[in-house]
Amino acid sequence: MTAEEIIQQILSKHPEVSRNQILENLEAEKSKTGGLIADETLLRLIAARYGVEILQDRVYRKLSISHLVPGLNDVTVTGRVVAVYPPRTFEGKKSGKFASLMIADKDAVLRVILWNDKVELIETGELKAGQIVRFSHGYTREDRKDKVELHLGNRSQIEVEPKNIKADEYPLIGKFATKINKITKAHENIHLTGTVKELFPASTFTRSDMSTGTIMRFTLADETGEIPVVVWNEKAEELGKSLKINANLQLVNAKIKENTNGKLEAHVNSYTYVEVSERLDF
């Protein structure tokens, strides 16, 4: 808050006080401190004497997703929501619920975990894909795949569409997609959009520990090319019931691998967000 804004707040609460009186008080304080303290700080002291509370501005240290590391305990980060996963419950010594979502800025994508009461923002539809959201007082952990993720607990705060941000620093969801002809082995995790061109039925297989799994394959195409997609386990069971030829598809956090023939494939697992839509603009 500027010095002028503080003066205006004092005047609005105490119209009997003149601007000159405030400035005289300011000069007196400056002479006492030898000019070593900023005018804004001195004016806050003067305001307090008049019983006027000047709230501190909320200052957020800008932290990009790519700078996050596991083990941080008081993190504030902002991103555009690109995927929202359904809430889940858990049982044990304590029971509760959690939900996860994916956010992104210009540099990277981050998985965010909401715990217990925070999940209500997803259940009520207040928090959804496409929004810019600021997450404050979170903590970072390493997931099972050695990726950093952000957790939001009781003391955390979530601000949907904060006012003091630049929207152009958080591209729209479609801008995160990589064109198929630009995919390389260097893309470990990727966001893709396209149309289903070939679709093969889901099938089961037996693992080395004799447990069973499910696999499904299809071909995804955009205006630049095509790529085979391999879908695993619960995602295969889910898509096997609903996916059709010519369906428009969005994949967030798919994994790129080489098959036995040296060709690139996109792999979809529980970490991948899948959205089927009627129409998709490239």
Label each PLM-derived region with a short phrase:
Residues 1-282:
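Single-stranded nucleic acid-binding proteins centered on OB/S1-type folds
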